[in-house]
């Protein structure tokens, strides 16, 4: 019994440990190998570990730039799963205590459970073996029978009309074999997918008709319009897959089941067409779409006390109204709608897809997909007492309304002046930025807005980026401040700490900082400051952008390591260029998702992302190869330095980039200041001399036009000097 209890507890602990490892891998922390652990243990035993060694080991194990809540996975959901596993361990231990009091019953229970599990496993194994043997046997018998029938037909046809009928028969046989093979592959992939869905989401799948067609011994007319149906179902959806007898996909149909009334509501035809095309062309893409449908269904079932389906319909209705108004406004210029307006909005079966940026070069070359976000629902964080931390509001309120609501909210009597000043600074910071696309295109409904049109959901919204984006901390803070405005407008009367309490907290924090400084001075560890500066430089957005551009342009040589300390040479349209980065460093992180709490946050977020994307593209354009042949060395150094134009780059991401260079004819230092607005608009100012106050208007206008079209500093400079 003790051995069985130990195994049961060990199984639970292993499950919890796997979830911990999944959490750490998701946020960028890599579990050290056994060899690394042994080396660290040996170093500890010999007391020879230095602070520098610890820092290096920590950097190898822990990826600092990925430790945030905006990566690919939902960290809160993983954390909640771990909490659930810990509760399971707690209840298991409590159950053990009860079993110890009744030892005899426990022995009988465990023996019975053990025999039951063994019998069930053996029964499942026997059933699976019988099913596989039956399937293989039927296929074999079917092939034998078909061969006999074909041989008989062949003999008869040879007697009547030998040559033509034999050829037709061979074609039919080959076609039958091909169709059987196609049906078998499709059935295998669908069965593998449905088994995974059934285990992960507790869905119910039926593939009997397809398997029956595959095992059928009767002759089938593969040219007819007959088809079989397979389906995947759950509490809130039904997915029908119609397949022709020749193995071609007829149609995929999605049906929604309302949890409140149980009524069946067919999905939009465009959603069915997307599912059908993905199943025909890309099975992996189809599986991802079905998994997203199951994820949404899992949320609907988890929060069945709340009508999430209504919240989801309100969300799609809001963006449908925005899409209609946006199409009317930009009916003659879709490029401006994509890059300057709200974006190209398209409803999805599990959310809302918004394509918000695509450069001119990418559009005409069709090399890359546009930048886009997918707005979906996801689980939010939970406090210790089980209450939800994050809640999203689904309504047709604009961001301007939220700002006005907060500005007109009267603070409570206990609210401190510093808190009021902080809230006012947030509002001022955001209102000073030109966010409103005419207040989100006046997306209120045509009829008067009802109270039921604004509801709060226990799950939050999330904007999932189709491409990870490197973003500065400053830009990310602006996005997070949008959430602060929404939350403060939800709870205007929340009691704030008094001024005395805030002063006490500040004094305690200051004492902690002073103690840390004193300990650093006593130890004389000046290397810590150097290490911090090195980390800031390593994880700066400038270094990350240069590293990504150099790795993509020199993918053939994995040993190349280009960073901000190196110069970078390139040749564009016959002009040899060399770039140095001599500016300050700004910390940056890579984000893949942005949680939001109100649909009105989407447009300001898109504007800030456009600004960051344009900065990233321009900055990287100085440090990547364009239609040139590489030299033999690792850094692509141009051998002949006589005709090389040298440019020094400084930046204030994502707002501006400054270029300083020596003019080849005037022998004077010229400079170009490039300013990037929050919506991605560009404006360049060309100064004939760094001492000049006024820019050259003609050159500034010309260089701005080149930048807007090319979104490349190196290309614009080459064309600019060639034009002169």
Swiss-Prot record:
Places the protein is found: Nucleus
Cellular component terms per the entry's GO annotation: mediator complex
Domain of life (superkingdom): Eukaryota
GO biological process, one term: positive regulation of transcription by RNA polymerase II
InterPro entries the record matches: Mediator_complex_subunit_1 (IPR051999), Mediator_Med1 (IPR019680)
Region Disordered: start-end pairs: 33-52, 147-167, 486-524
GO molecular function ontology, one term from the record: transcription coregulator activity
Function: Component of the Mediator complex, a coactivator involved in the regulated transcription of nearly all RNA polymerase II-dependent genes. Mediator functions as a bridge to convey information from gene-specific regulatory proteins to the basal RNA polymerase II transcription machinery. Mediator is recruited to promoters by direct interactions with regulatory proteins and serves as a scaffold for the assembly of a functional preinitiation complex with RNA polymerase II and the general transcription factors.
Quaternary structure annotation from Swiss-Prot or TrEMBL: Component of the Mediator complex.
Protein name (database record): Putative mediator of RNA polymerase II transcription subunit 1
Lineage: Eukaryota, Amoebozoa, Evosea, Eumycetozoa, Dictyostelia
Gene for this chain: med1
